[in-house]
Amino acid sequence: MAGRLLSVENIDVYYGEFQALFGVSLEVYEGEVVALVGANGAGKTTTLKTISGLLRPRRGRIVWEGQDITSVPAYQRAELGIVHVPEGRGIFPYLTVYENLVVAAYTRRARERFEESLEMVYELFPRLRERKRQLAGTMSGGEQQMLAIARALIQRPRLLMLDEPSLGLAPKLAREVVYLARRLRDEYGITVLLVEQNVRLSLKVADRAYVLETGRVVREGPAGELEKDPEIRRAYLGI
């Protein structure tokens, strides 16, 4: 098995006095696509925010390649290669497509290989090359999502965390965006941690998955096995 990139070890996370995560643990190995699935409010987005450094756990650890990074600020985690595409895209609507990509290259690892990364994202998303002088806020929802992912790729991620990448997209485009996770792994060697509202689709794309309910990991295993599990099928797949 490839080396372990990330370990989340028994974390408790709060918003004020409200506890959102209860002893959550998970692992991500290099070259995997790992899915976090669960109902709205289960704690999936909170888990990603904690890994990226936007939230600090009150208990437990975040370990990256064997090093405890629990106290490392978010901007330094980006330098390590931990890159987060948040729900809602997070682009700059009044900048052009190209300017959005330039601004994304704020880490040293991104600046050093910007031109190479730019060609990579233009190959993945030819529409962005065509519209590089267009204001980002005037593009369609699907194009904005492409740009959000492209901005993350400019940062040369080793772990790319995608939070609800298909949200608000038409079904065909949503499927293409989610399957992009597998393409990034297969063609570019990028490890992906995926949160996706379409549980059926995310289990088809992922190698392994964790199921969260009310802030706790209640199931984990190979995605194909979870997809066939009667309880998962009944609770999340409507079967």
Q: PLM features: what roles do these ranges have?
A:
Residues S52:
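Helix-to-loop junction immediately C-terminal to a conserved catalytic motif
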Residues A152-L153:
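ABC ATPase C-loop
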Residues G16, V72, V97-E116, L124-R129, ...:
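ABC-type ATPase nucleotide-binding domains, specifically the catalytic core motifs of the NBD
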Residues R175-G189:
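Helical segment within the ABC ATPase nucleotide-binding domain
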Residues R156:
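Conserved catalytic motifs of ABC-family nucleotide-binding domains
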Residues G60-Q67, L80, R113-L118:
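Conserved ABC transporter NBD signature motif
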Residues V37-A39:
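The feature captures the beta-strand-to-loop junction immediately N-terminal to the Walker
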